[in-house]
Amino acid sequence: MKKPENVDQLLSALDHPLNDAVSTLRKIILDTDPNIAEQVKWNSPSYYYTGEMAPFDPKEYKRDIVVVNLHKKDSILLVFPTGARINDPSGLLEGKFTDGRKVIKFASSEEVKTHLVDLKNVVRNWIETIEKDV
């Protein structure tokens, strides 16, 4: 199978029981801020910040907001590579990884819709942590 060039191609070829939830998550994340774009990274939908930022080492993944891990058929795992820096009063973010990542696990479209506001707040709070070069 040919490697997908963009998220549309990736999702159109996706055979996952939670396709509807993936589409809902995509819309929620992209609608949260006009400076969020998407790409295929690590063979998954990935969302990153396109706005102004202070210079940084690309290996720090400071532009990467969230990667959608679709490797399990019974759930979707949102991986925030720098999630430890996010203020999350809702408690939606989980994990104590030494590399600073945090995750959110969804098992259904209904669960995604239930946490829509909290997820948008997590993404907004991530954007607030950005060191801007102004």
Language model features: what each stretch is:
Residues 1-134:
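Charge-dense, helix-prone N-terminal extensions
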